[in-house]
Amino acid sequence: MAIPVVVVGCAGKMGREVVKAVHAAPDMAVVGAVDRSHIDEDAGELAGIGPIDVLVTDNLEITCAMVAQERAPGVMVDFTHPRGIYDRVRSAIAYGVRPVVGTTGLPPEHIEELAEFADKASTGCIVAPNFAIGMILLQQACLRAAEYFDHVEIIELHHNRKADAPSGTALATAQMIATTGKTFNVPEVSESELVAGARGGMTPGDIRIHSLRLPGLLAHQAVIFGGLGQSYTLRHDTTDRAAYMPGVLLAIRKVLGLKSLVYGLEKII
């Protein structure tokens, strides 16, 4: 039986990719499409795949209630703005619909509260700052490199319509490196910034992140390690949003077997 999937933000760039990917998956079906715009338009037409007989609505509650009547457990995929995501996830869980969230910029306290809510409801939920498999492999390689290098900085580059900085992926990468427990980037000179912020933002793990926002970019990240007489650069480039879809489809399948919130795609690979 096909997994019923609701796509929130279906009119956005990521939402349209999700509609296409889910519709093409043999074990899934788009049964709901939610957005603030393009009401009553066919979600398939918006995604460029032709009509799929699913009309866009702005009412998530009614959509989740409808999905709850399906014989198979439903999943909500949300790649929208962080504003309101907390309430949307709670609404989905209340109806037994499993959320898969790719929205970045969620405050840690909201993630903790959602984890408690999912635990009490014994309902699976996946929140991930990045769904690109290549990025997950990069982060895992960073842990290995961090064993041998004492200096590291992160440069993340995104399109100029990305609202949050640094990216959730860059923050997650810094946090992952910091779990090694090492002290990184001990200064060897007394630094002074001639322009405020020139050295980037410092994370709690003493790892600097530099954020670039430019037209012509999509999503890119470089993690640069430095040591005596050498540097080591790990880089991942996303040139098309289709890169996220294998991870999204994996999360949709995996969330059905969970009873709590999982943060990070690396936890289910």
Curated annotation (Swiss-Prot):
PROSITE patterns recorded for this chain? DAPB
Q: Can the keyword Amino-acid biosynthesis be found in this entry's annotation?
A: yes
Q: Name one GO molecular function term.
A: NAD binding
Query: Which controlled-vocabulary keywords does the entry list?
Result: Amino-acid biosynthesis, Cytoplasm, Diaminopimelate biosynthesis, Lysine biosynthesis, NAD, NADP, Oxidoreductase
* Xref: SUPFAM superfamilies: Glyceraldehyde-3-phosphate dehydrogenase-like, C-terminal domain (SSF55347), NAD(P)-binding Rossmann-fold domains (SSF51735)
> Its GO CC terms?
cytosol
Catalysis: reaction(s):
(S)-2,3,4,5-tetrahydrodipicolinate + NAD(+) + H2O = (2S,4S)-4-hydroxy-2,3,4,5-tetrahydrodipicolinate + NADH + H(+); (S)-2,3,4,5-tetrahydrodipicolinate + NADP(+) + H2O = (2S,4S)-4-hydroxy-2,3,4,5-tetrahydrodipicolinate + NADPH + H(+)
Binding-site list for NAD(+): 9-14, 35, 102-104, 128-131
* GO BP of this protein: diaminopimelate biosynthetic process; lysine biosynthetic process via diaminopimelate
Compartments it resides in: Cytoplasm
Query: What is the designated name of this protein?
Result: 4-hydroxy-tetrahydrodipicolinate reductase
| UniProt organism field | Gloeobacter violaceus (strain ATCC 29082 / PCC 7421)
